[in-house]
Amino acid sequence: MSIQESAAAYESATQYFLNLARGVMKDQLDIKNPEGWSARQIIHHLADSEAQSYARLRRLVAEPEGSTIQGYDENLWAVAPQLGYESAPVENSIAVFAAVRAGSLDIVNRLEESDLEKSGVHTEAGHYTIAKWLEGYTNHPKDHGDQLVRALKGLN
């Protein structure tokens, strides 16, 4: 897939998740099933994950090859009461997701094919290229968008 096709897929995934998240009604936010997160938790997770992705892409672009790309424990973040996954309004998280994705897309649109092989060392995943970043963060909102649909249907 060319960088232009990858950028288009990244943007499409952004719009897919935003359309779903913006369509969740307030009385649907806390629909939860035993195996998964509620719609509220999914939306907050996507905002936090994208904040991580924003920093990761910039490190991969700007820092020397082999720089450390920090992981994080999403499950710990999800249960930290101060982060509000269980209760905070989702509007700010939707705005963060949209803004961060737009900023990252600007960078993706300036990449050249050769940039896709720039790499760092992810603390959990090991060797980590811009291509791997792009693939992962293109799929991530699609996967969680599908999870959001299932949560609203009461399935997982």
Residue spans of the language-model regions?
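Solvent-exposed, charged/polar functional surfaces in cytosolic regulatory/catalytic domains
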Residues: 16-23, 100-107, 143, 147
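Short acidic/polar alpha-helix capping motifs at helix-coil junctions
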Residues: 4-7, 19-23, 68-70, 80-86, ...
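Alpha-helical structural elements of signaling/regulatory helical domains
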Residues: 2, 48, 52, 88-89, ...
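Acidic/histidine-rich alpha-helical segments that form the ligand environment
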Residues: 9, 13, 78-117, 137
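Hydrophobic residues in alpha-helical segments
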Residues: 21, 60-61, 108-111
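Alpha-helical bundle segments that constitute or directly flank the non-heme di-iron/ferroxidase center
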Residues: 1-26, 51-55, 59, 136-140
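Short, contiguous alpha-helical
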Residues: 28-76, 105, 116-156
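Solvent-exposed interaction patches of small proteins and small membrane subunits
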Residues: 1, 5-8, 31, 62-65, ...
